[in-house]
Amino acid sequence: MKKSTKLLAGIVTLASAMTLAACQSTNDNTSVITMKGDTISVSDFYNETKNTEISQRAMLNLVVSRVFEDQYGKKVSKKKTEEAYNKSAEQYGASFSAALAQSGLTTDTYKRQIRSAMLVEYAVKEAAKKELTDADYKKAYESYTPEMTTQVITLDNEETAKAILGEVKAEGADFAAIAKEKTTAADKKVDYKFDSGDTKLPADVIKAASGLKEGDISEVVSVLDPATYQNKFYIVKVTKKAEKASDWKKYKKRLKEIVLAEKTQNIDFQNKVIAKALDKANVKIKDQAFANILAQYANTDKKASKANTSKSDQKTSSDSSKDSQSSKSKSEK
């Protein structure tokens, strides 16, 4: 049931955003609560809660959601939103409804949260495509390992994993047979094919496999399962490894996918794209209680400006130094 407590990071803020939106669309004097001798109005509730951290984040989410729906809404179909929702529901299985309820969400509010995330993801990916250079491809190629055929044992206990490692490394051991017998993977799957940029297994497992030669067996790889907050332990054997071509262009399509994935996951790059969208939308904050909710995006522009200014100052300083040296040389002559 631990899985149900981690539906998505920050998911509650969207539900709060909907509450704030409802408050703002209702008459300020509308009573929310009545009691003997007093009432609590929408305005009372709004003023009491707007300065809290969760309300600040909720308003930010609401602004970003509205801006990206306006600018990119036609780029992500409702069908794709439904597919993403269904996939999430499938992953949580029977605990999905409980997870939604515990997070204060309904089916509709969760779908809106998913859609907002998909719109931002689309915008970030499109921006990343425009910045792709040969240097990006070459850098990705340096750390790229082509397709590997592997056998993977998944275990829940470190002591057991270490014991099984001894078994599979023993002379004459049948790794595949031991893997099929011992793995605790839900689907009992042990055979995998992937390259170094794949995500079908944890990154540390793929990294360990990438560093192995054909026929080698890894040490025990410990990975924290984000769904259960429990460690899982992996043992990998590489049974076949494709030889890496000397020309990066052979992998251009795959390298593009890897570079774009890295860029879209980069927080600074995400903030840069969001900042540009907010600027285009001409967002104006009317209530000073929310004056700083966009600060992280304003800082993105300032950092870029500062970096450009620094480069400009360095160039000016360098040019001045050259001029000074030139003048000195002429004077000496």
From Swiss-Prot:
PROSITE patterns membership: PPIC_PPIASE_2, PROKAR_LIPOPROTEIN
Biased composition (Basic and acidic residues): 312-322
Lipid-bearing positions (S-diacylglycerol cysteine): 23
Cell compartment(s), UniProt: Cell membrane
Pfam families in UniProt: Rotamase_2 (PF13145)
Biased composition, class Low complexity, residue ranges: 323-333
Protein name: Foldase protein PrsA
Originating gene: prsA
